Amino acid sequence: MAQMYFYYSAMNAGKSTTLLQSSFNYQERGMNPAIFTAAIDDRYGVGKVSSRIGLHAEAHLFNKETNVFDAIKELHEAEKLHCVLIDECQFLTKEQVYQLTEVVDKLNIPALCYGLRTDFLGELFEGSKYLLSWADKLVELKTICHCGRKANMVIRTDEHGVAIADGDQVAIGGNELYVSVCRRHYKEALGK
Amino acid sequence: MAQMYFYYSAMNAGKSTTLLQSSFNYQERGMNPAIFTAAIDDRYGVGKVSSRIGLHAEAHLFNKETNVFDAIKELHEAEKLHCVLIDECQFLTKEQVYQLTEVVDKLNIPALCYGLRTDFLGELFEGSKYLLSWADKLVELKTICHCGRKANMVIRTDEHGVAIADGDQVAIGGNELYVSVCRRHYKEALGK
Amino acid sequence: MAQMYFYYSAMNAGKSTTLLQSSFNYQERGMNPAIFTAAIDDRYGVGKVSSRIGLHAEAHLFNKETNVFDAIKELHEAEKLHCVLIDECQFLTKEQVYQLTEVVDKLNIPALCYGLRTDFLGELFEGSKYLLSWADKLVELKTICHCGRKANMVIRTDEHGVAIADGDQVAIGGNELYVSVCRRHYKEALGK
Amino acid sequence: MAQMYFYYSAMNAGKSTTLLQSSFNYQERGMNPAIFTAAIDDRYGVGKVSSRIGLHAEAHLFNKETNVFDAIKELHEAEKLHCVLIDECQFLTKEQVYQLTEVVDKLNIPALCYGLRTDFLGELFEGSKYLLSWADKLVELKTICHCGRKANMVIRTDEHGVAIADGDQVAIGGNELYVSVCRRHYKEALGK
């Protein structure tokens, strides 16, 4: 029975590396994984999953209008898929997370989703909210705060490194925009 | 460093039993745990945590207005607390979940929260939403669907056992109102 | 696909309570679980699993000569089993753990095993060794050291509470014989 | 409080990639991790941790005589260590695993150990045995069997791909020597 996994973490934990390693494991055994990532994330070029550690692979793109069930079904009918891997899954919509449960339940294809848990205001992204609600397995990928404790929150900083407490949920950026911190230092940075 | 745990499950998985066992473990070592439960849940009498398997213990009550940080701090100052255990934590508000992070971060008291993940419409309760967002550890307590697979969703049924797809989020009830099922049988029961 | 779980912990973590709750969950859905425990453990009467919190249930017994595959197969043929629950699984032999993998792999019956990880000398029991080797899922049931940290080791004490560093691996006893402690206090108690 | 983690898996699951990503996470925050690997493993050159996916880093070497506590303490005194990462940890001796618990308990440095669980005969390696006994956290890194299920066992094959049921525990090799499989196909391959 296929299952849906949500691998969640703060930023810079190595989600994309873990995704690419899983994909490698499937291919190494002659299997056919399909990789998707958010069209919104053009940090490293469109249609690519890249990890800061130096790995990358081609990826299908999804945006808010994509019907991921249909897209995956089409790929599966062209060539049997053994697994789908979704990077930046926090950018999925509620409907797309539901479509992914159908990929798992109806097409019996495992879905491994990798993404952030909360935004810089500590609120769930829509995709994360419904993955946390419906996924079979919730697995935390760990990274560390500057204090050495586990980091599970994300601060958005301005160009002076000062934490920002308002603004749009999404402003794609690498290290210079976001910092992963523990809950204590998150509160401290936002003066809570 | 104290941590916040969210022990989540569908209904009838033994959350209260697990809570009572943890409390027992602390007391057995001469430590002082405090138990809280939702005032809304009067199935087994007010101010009590009871498990269907036959265990029960006195519990402090919280409702939407309770400041759980103040309530716990007061108890802690009267007699050092080694842990707080929250049953029916899905009924916490966003603000109360935040107050609990302060109990953990500022008073360094571990908080073990036990509750449902999603309601009969597959939506997160407010308490579950913010525990899934901010807790240090997410631990699933397993129970089974009638088909033998893991149950991670909840159906609300009418007196004829037919699944209901509308109504208030909360209608406190035991086996006769709610059934825990796997995702596939959840969809089937709601004709999805 | 059935799986083999090893729920391990130090002493007094509530393993038997957790086992009895799982059994209750299966029965509540009209399913048929079978409970086994070690004949060697006569603390609460033979053929019974009891938890210090006050719960108990009848149990089939196994000793070193029992062929658990045959015993389970016989029960299964008499009335379909949905799950087997093994208490005190540290007392299983290597061969019996292998037989349990056959119950899972050949009879497709889930096996939930509950037991200690290491003895008072920090060495694995034979049953624990092969469950740690072959089980599909390793799940820790937590309990606490007198210092508040997680307890993952066990000290055997004499009647004066002084830790003992030699003697037979097995001397069945309750609180008065054994104390669960964290690794640091384990080393301290044994003067390491 | 530092903890000891044992990241275990069958072969070709990406243990080295995960280790290198953890190391990268620490360095990215200006911290100083130390990497160790077994001198016995010269597949990719001595003193190097390499992952099949194309990543590598310098590593300190340990062999059966190395006192890892002294080696780490020396590094720590030269420049504060924030974490030690041990690859091929199955090749540690019992004494070396104990020394690592002292690194965690006495020097308060987290130890992340990555390695195999069982050998081609289904028996624990010495290092794995004592990590499974004493580690604070046991985390499984997943890979897949040719049948699509999770692989948790390892077959050693001859040049014709036929499973071998005897021979030394250690014969360092890549894909051509070892294949990770699920328990069912492990038994099948060895004619059990």
Swiss-Prot record, chains A, B, C, D:
UniProt-listed PROSITE patterns: TK_CELLULAR_TYPE
Gene3D superfamilies on file: 3.30.60.20, P-loop containing nucleotide triphosphate hydrolases
Annotated localization: Cytoplasm
Reaction(s) catalysed by this chain's protein: thymidine + ATP = dTMP + ADP + H(+)
UniProt KW keywords: ATP-binding, Cytoplasm, DNA synthesis, Kinase, Metal-binding, Nucleotide-binding, Transferase, Zinc
InterPro entries: P-loop_NTPase, Thymidine_kinase, Thymidine_kinase_CS
GO MF annotations in UniProt: ATP binding; thymidine kinase activity; zinc ion binding
Principal subcellular localisation of the protein: cytoplasm
GO annotation (BP), single: thymidine metabolic process
Lineage: superkingdom: Bacteria
Keyword rRNA-binding (UniProt): no
Residues given in the record as ATP binding sites: S9, A10, M11, N12, A13, G14, K15, S16, D87, E88, C89, Q90
Catalytic site positions: E88 (proton acceptor)
One Pfam family named in its UniProt record: TK
Binding positions (Zn(2+)): C145, C147, C182, H185
EC number: 2.7.1.21
One Gene Ontology cellular component: cytosol
Nucleotide-binding among keywords: yes
HAMAP family hit by this protein: Thymidine_kinase
Family per record: Belongs to the thymidine kinase family.
PANTHER family: THYMIDINE KINASE, THYMIDINE KINASE, CYTOSOLIC
Subunit details: Homotetramer.
Name this protein carries in UniProt: Thymidine kinase
Organism, as annotated: Aliivibrio fischeri (strain ATCC 700601 / ES114) (Vibrio fischeri)
Top-level taxonomy: Bacteria, Pseudomonadati, Pseudomonadota, Gammaproteobacteria, Vibrionales
